[in-house]
Design a protein with these regions (language model features):
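Conserved LRR concave beta-strand detector
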Residues: 12, 33, 43, 57, ...
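Leucine-rich repeat
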Residues: 21, 42, 66, 89-90, ...
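Structural signal for repeat-unit boundaries in curved repeat scaffolds
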Residues: 7, 28, 38-41, 52, ...
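Membrane-proximal C-terminal cap and juxtamembrane stalk of leucine-rich repeat ectodomains
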Residues: 1, 6-12, 201, 246-303
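Ankyrin-repeat and related helical/solenoid repeat scaffolds used for protein-protein interactions
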Residues: 186, 197-261
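Consensus "Asn ladder" position of solenoid repeat domains
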Residues: 18, 39, 60-63, 84-87, ...
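LRR N-terminal entry segment and analogous cap-like coil->beta motifs
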Residues: 8-57, 61-64
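Recurring C-terminal helix/loop segment of individual leucine-rich repeat
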Residues: 22-26, 46-50, 70-74, 94-98, ...
Length: 303
């Protein structure tokens, strides 16, 4: 018997049969959501989604897809969600999203993408969520994300990014969450965050940052969470203090120089230090291995 046979008039189709190797046929036109996940599916025919004019969600995670046909999504202009997590994709056809201008949620996490093509994003003005984590990206072309004016969350964590191109975030006025954790970033340009004034959560932990440009976080007046843990920072930059809850700040695992500039900044902004126990001074010698928070509020700092 063929695994996972479609039911007539059903609106949702789910198949997680490990032996499935061909995309199911005969799905009813009433289908709104398809989940074919954790299977042996390695290829899709160009007509896989033909006759499904109402399809809004397509979940294809944890299969063995190494390529997608350029015309795959042409029959489904109503698509809102596409999840391709944990496949073997090393590239996508340039025009794959040309007809899916209603797409809101695109997940490409856990593939083998090395290069981003700006053409992918040209028609995705309604996209709100883009997950490109855990690929092999070494760069993001300038302006690649410029059409994504509705984007609220961008995940580029666990790639191979050593620098961020000037203008990489241009056009992302609605962006609230940016994850750059686990890359190879050694430095950031002073104007990096100017295009994203709505940012609320910024994750930069587990990079190779040695210094931050003066005022780099000044445009981020709505920032609630800033994670700089496990970099190589000795001096700190922070966004301006804003009304409302204190900034959640993780600066653990850095070799902090507990000089007057750092201590005065922490006193002024008064962030909520996450993992304060692992946030230690590396210098000067008299403060070495003491908690930054303790030194900041001690009365013996000569500042």
């Amino acid at each position: 018997a063929v695994p996972c046979s479609p039911q007539p008039d059903a609106t949702r189709f789910v198949c997680t049969e490990p032996t499935l190797s061909a995309f199911p046929t005969g799905l009813p036109p009433s289908t709104v959501a398809i989940s074919v996940e954790f299977t042996a599916l390695a290829t899709l025919p160009p007509t896989a989604l033909a006759g499904l004019p109402r399809l809004q969600e397509l979940h294809l995670s944890s299969n063995r897809l190494a390529a997608l046909p350029g015309a795959l999504l042409r029959p489904v202009p109503t698509l809102r969600v596409l999840d391709l997590t944990d496949n073997l994709l090393d590239e996508l056809p340039a025009g794959i999203f040309t007809g899916t201008s209603l797409l809101q949620h695109l997940v490409l996490r856990g593939n083998r993408l090395r290069v981003l093509q700006p053409a992918w994003f040209r028609h995705l003005a309604q996209l709100e969520w883009l997950d490109l984590a855990a690929n092999a990206l070494t760069e993001v072309p300038p302006m690649a994300f410029h059409p994504l004016r509705s984007l609220q969350s961008l995940d580029l964590s666990h790639n191979e990014l050593a620098t961020l191109a000037p203008g990489m975030l241009d056009g992302l006025k609605a962006l609230e969450r940016l994850n750059l954790e686990g890359n190879r970033l050694g430095t950031l340009l002073p104007a990096t965050f100017v295009p994203v004034p709505s940012l609320r959560l910024l994750f930069l932990q587990d990079n190779k940052l040695q210094a931050l440009p003066d005022g780099i976080f000044l445009p981020l007046r709505h920032l609630h969470v800033l994670d700089l843990a496990r970099n190589q920072l000795r001096a700190l930059e922070l966004p301006p203090r804003s009304p409302g809850p204190a900034l959640d700040l993780d600066i653990s695992g850095n070799p902090w120089a507990c000089e007057c500039q750092l201590l005065a900044l922490l006193r002024r902004v008064s962030p909520q230090l996450v993992t304060a126990r692992d946030t230690l001074c590396a210098s000067p010698p008299r403060y070495r291995a003491r908690e930054v928070a303790t030194v900041t509020w001690a009365g013996d700092t000569d500042c």
